[in-house]
Structure formats: C-alpha cells, structure tokens
Amino acid sequence: MLTNPSQVIIRNQETLSQHRVLVLNHEADSLPKALLDVAQSVDALALDYHHYLHLAPQANAKLRCYFGHQLPHQDKYDTVIVYFPKAKPLAPYLFNLAAQHLVADGQLLVVGENKGGVKSLVKLLPKYFATGVKLDNARHCLLFGSSIIDTAPEIKLSDWTSQYQLATPQGNITICNLVGVFSEKHLDQGTELLLSHLPTLSGRVLDFGCGAGVIAAALLKAQPTLSLECIDINAMALASCELTLAANGMTAKVYPSDGLAQTSGKFDGIISNPPFHDGLASTTSIAQSFVADSAKQLQSKGIWQIVANRHLPYSDTIAAEFGQLTVPAENNKYKLYSFQQA
C-alpha cells in the first residue's frame, strides 16, 4: 500500500522514464521499488530507521537502500524526489542535500501532504533552485517541480547545527542540535525530573531514544567511566548525539535501533525519557514492547529508570513486566519509574 504522497508520485512517474532517481526522506512503503517500472535505477535514503527497515529487504541490483543524514557517496541523479518533512526546519537541509546529487539539467520533485506544510515550498526553496512549479494536486497532496539554476554550497553539518550550553543537575553541558531534532534549549520537565534523580550506575548502560544526547552527556558528565550506548530511529538525532558527545569530549556507541531489536546482550542500566508522550495506540504499543524487551535485557542487579507522562497508561504494563516497582519522584505532569533487577 502506497501512502498518499507516493500515489501522487506514481501519477507522474512518466517524467522519470529511464532516469537515475534518488528518493530522499521516503516513507514506510514500496514507492522506490515501484519506480523501477519506469526508472533506470533508484537509490533511497531514509532518515527514519523504521522506513529503512521496511524498504531494505526489497533492495536489488537497481534499488539501493540507505539510512542516515547523508549518502555514503557523491553519485549524481537525473531526478531527486524529496518527501517534505514533518519537521519543517529540516526541509532546507534536504534541498541542499538534493542539490549535491543532481546533474546540471536534473529535476527536483517535492511532494507532501497539504496539511504538512508543503504549501510553503515556494518560500523555502533556496535561491540556487528555480521557483517551484505546482505539477499536481491530488490525494490531499501537492507535487512541485524545480531545477538547479546556481551552484549550491557544500553541506557542512556545522551550518545546520544549533549549539548551546545547557545547565543540568550534573553540571553544564554543550548540546549540538541539528535541524529537525526537537529541542527547547532548556531542560524539559520530564528530563529534569529524570536527571535530578539519576541512580549511580556502572558497566554497560543504554540511553533509549537518545535525541540530541542531553541525557547521554549528563550521564557521562556525572559518571565518565560508563560504557554507554545511545539509540534512536532518527538519523538527524543520532548525528546530533554524536556531535554533542564530541563537543563535550565524551565517547559512546551511537547507532540506530528499532526498539531494542538492534541491541545485543544485556545492560547494567537502561535510562530513558522515551518519545511516547502522545498516547496514540501506535506509540502505546511501541512503549509496551520497549518495557517488555527491557525486562529481558537487564542484567542481574541492573537498574531500569524512565520518566513518562503521568496520564499515560504505562503503570500496569511496567508493573506486569517488572513486578516490584518504585516511583522515586513525580510532579504534576511526569512520573519517574524505577526498577532494580534481582
């Protein structure tokens, strides 16, 4: 099943006949493979690890699948398709990336849902692209076309990074935040509650849903000998976390994981302000899987501690998996859940 934006691309696929195509920020469907009906070859770069895992099994000699914030090569393409991102500040970065990979007379296609901000494309396109032209309007989506008219600057992550000092209970740390990664530039209430009651940890520790690396840097500030692993599904978050750790002179293993599926072995500590705050059925299911998998991957005497919105129904799930559970701290919005393995 193709998403609505992908269906709009298929409606206009005749423009891709025998083209070398690059798809940036694709969704969790098979659009890149479907384009092989007309295209010479397709490369697809996912910025969401779930989307990459969905497509990767379909890779073949003409379809290459990648995950990350950039491609591992400098290949050029006749057409670059950009899915307009949910995080609007990420859009100019994707356009800059597209420009690096377009041949001189290549075409840029940008597709997105009307409610997702794609209507503002004309204002967001950098000056090295021609004014965006509306090519289609269907499935509650818009498709725009453009082309390169000037040399685009090379991508330097520093140009797309906001760097700032953050005061934490463990001391001041430097945060590096790439475009498209959530940041309030101060400690949110949930993270502050978690960091204010950090347990003493040792050995191998996991930061689940690491984001830009706030919790990771605070952990290593207080306990620099930890063997820390940081996981997330968002490529820009993972790159931000790596930059944050480097800016603070810290090291950790940073990698993508779908839940805990790409981790291995057991941990002496699992710490998280998990991204499960909206209460939707989909994220509630992910949260329940995280809790269940955590219980299996905690060493004897291992410590598990997360902070969560107090109105979300996680208490029963956590209690069912861990049994003996403590709530060492809470406020009017968040609860801190803690467990130590027997």
UniProtKB/Swiss-Prot annotation:
**Localisation:** Cytoplasm
Q: Which UniProt keywords apply?
A: Cytoplasm, Methyltransferase, rRNA processing, S-adenosyl-L-methionine, Transferase
Recorded hits in Pfam families, A to Z, give: MTS, MTS_N
Question: What does the record give as the reaction this protein catalyses?
Answer: guanosine(1207) in 16S rRNA + S-adenosyl-L-methionine = N(2)-methylguanosine(1207) in 16S rRNA + S-adenosyl-L-homocysteine + H(+)
Which InterPro entries does the record cross-reference, listed alphabetically?
DNA_methylase_N6_adenine_CS, Mtase_sm_N, rRNA_ssu_MeTfrase_C, RsmC/RlmG, SAM-dependent_MTases_sf, Small_mtfrase_dom
Q: Which family does it belong to?
A: Belongs to the methyltransferase superfamily. RsmC family.
Protein's name in the database: Ribosomal RNA small subunit methyltransferase C
Native organism: Shewanella sp. (strain MR-7)
Whichever gene encodes this chain, its name is: rsmC
